[in-house]
Every structure is written in C-alpha cells, then in structure tokens.
C-alpha cells in the first residue's frame, strides 16, 4: 500500500479503511474482490513485483536475480493465480532512472528485475496456453523475447 500511496496519490489510511485486506495470495485476493460490492466490472493481472517481494524479500528482489528455488516458487504462484482467473502477468519496466519510484524512493522491483527471470515467468503462460503480458515501458528487444517465450500477446 505504501508504494500505491506514493504513485497513485491515495492515502495509506484511506486504502486501509476503504478496501478489504483479508487476503495474502492472488487467488485469495480474487475471492475477496468477488465478495466486495463493485460499481464496475473488473479483471486482474498478477503483478510480478509483489510476487518477487513475497518470495525473495524486498532487498533481495531489488539486488539480485532469483535463485532456482525462488524462480520455481514465483512460477508456481503465477500458475496458481492464472488458475484462479488472472488475465496474465504485469510489470513496470521503466529502468533505474524512472520517476515512478517505490515507497522508499528506490526503483520498483520490476524496474530492476533480471531479464532472464522475466522470460522464465513468461514461459508459465506458454505452459498454460493462455494469458497476456502487460508491460509499462521496457526495451523492445526484451519485450520481443517475452512474446517469443510465452507465445502470448503483450499489452505494451
């Protein structure tokens, strides 16, 4: 929520009081959304930054590649969220110089994410034969690798 407070200009307390926080996993989040009254239809992507922070810890996610166990767990969580109804995976890829920063003023996790890790995450969509990759920014050559690895469309 602190990252959202900084970038979306919605106060932390407002989010805390105005939204249910009765979930931990993406499937639980989707169940919570289902229970919550809404005025509009909605669909979700699985954001890679929170998954990486959940599995690796914030400092590790911002400072190194995933190890094999972490990569496998993130891929498992992506598959789990897709099975629960997620549209695909999403990431901000604006680089270290992005002005859209994390709550502590440093780049977002996915701005620093290793390209090869991202490609491995995209392969989950190929395995499932469905889903989209949503990327804010990013290098065209990397985005092309993602589409090739996933066999899926990209929203860029």
Question: Which residues are covered by each model-predicted region?
Answer:
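Divalent-metal coordination cores built from histidine and acidic residues
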Residues: 1-89
